[in-house]
Amino acid sequence: MEQNNRIWWKEAVVYQIYPRSFKDSNGDGIGDLCGIISCLDYIKSLGVDVIWLNPIYASPNDDNGYDISDYRAIMKEFGTMEDFDLLLREVHARNLKLILDLVVNHTSDEHPWFQEARKSRKNPYYTYYHWWPVEQETPPLRPSYFEESAWTYDPHTRAWYLHYFSRKQPDLNWENREVREAVYDMMRFWFDKGIDGFRMDSIPLIAKDPAFPPIDRKKYPDLFSSYAHGPHLHEYLHEMNREVLSKYDIMTVGEGSAVTYKEVEKFVGPERQELDMLYGFGPSEVRNYTTADCPDSGIGYSLIALKKMFSGWDKAVGKGWPAIYLGNHDQPRMLSRFGDDRPQFRVYAAKMLATFLLTMRGTPYWLAGDEIGMCNPKFDRIGDYRDIATLNQYKQIEKRKGDTQWFLQMQQQTSRDNARTPFQWDNSGQPECPGSE
């Protein structure tokens, strides 16, 4: 490769930090920005190039920061904007780069836009979100990822609002040009500060079919496939690239929920001018959790299926560039999922998985803690969990008088909280963050 054609993010290793669980600097039991600053030399010593932070914006924390109430402010538990500016300077001083999460499928219901929107149908912010007025009778069936229905009734406007996730995460209306311009302006704010890119959360979901055809969870169990790739999705991403992304030397990676082999190149093909990378959900689909699914080896996965998945994704990306991962904040720990976390095999399995990630074509993504072989915690009480998806699903099973013990056993393998426990800075067996739960 010619020196002047080298693209920095193609040669990078990305280190993902879930801030709440990483390093606590003030003893309140919550990881924070100053804690991350104190660990930058350690991070640099790992040989990584890019730090990706999960959401650090102001949030009421219904979904651990993925419900944003102010895109231009820092969550108080994490610190201040001055702390962030110092973090960014210290990152760059070590020749590292910093990318943030971009969460623009939805906001928090405490965001000023939604607070204004629910005052009146005549309020200019009303059209920033998706609504179904009572005059149109009951809204079409739309299951939520976190709740039974993706519609919640608002008495102030006498209309239901749409939320694919929690009812405290109303979905933005990307058909509204003002919404898109507001998002682009916010992105410029962070790029002008000097950040080096965005990981884009749930990006295939931002475009909605305004007719809202009914979705029956029994007929369409894969809601991501049902909700992704709405009208004008690629027009929006191309517009975002033209208006914002192309103006900066940055990297972008999209969360590729429901993106198939046939569709991935539409997002990352160089001629498309949309995103740089997209990570698919293949690793989450290869792993089996029932003996019926994997009768030969019990709870496990097929090595052949794993190979086919990665080979297929690499081929489908074409002239684009793959994002390579085996775990993140939404998945169980990769060692417990794809390796063997028993003490006698843990080190060997962790090194094997690391070798796999680092020898594939593409940019590898590494979740903080994987480098020391962190495993699933295997919680056995619902009170140990903080993930809204786990908690809401448990309530639904209780309501139906289902088997909650079976559910808890499955959550030991599948819950997002498996990847969100405190970073183990020593071998004491206690959380690094004093007072943390």
Task: Cite the ranges covered by each PLM segment.
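Active-site and adjacent substrate-binding regions of carbohydrate-active enzymes
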Residues: 1-437
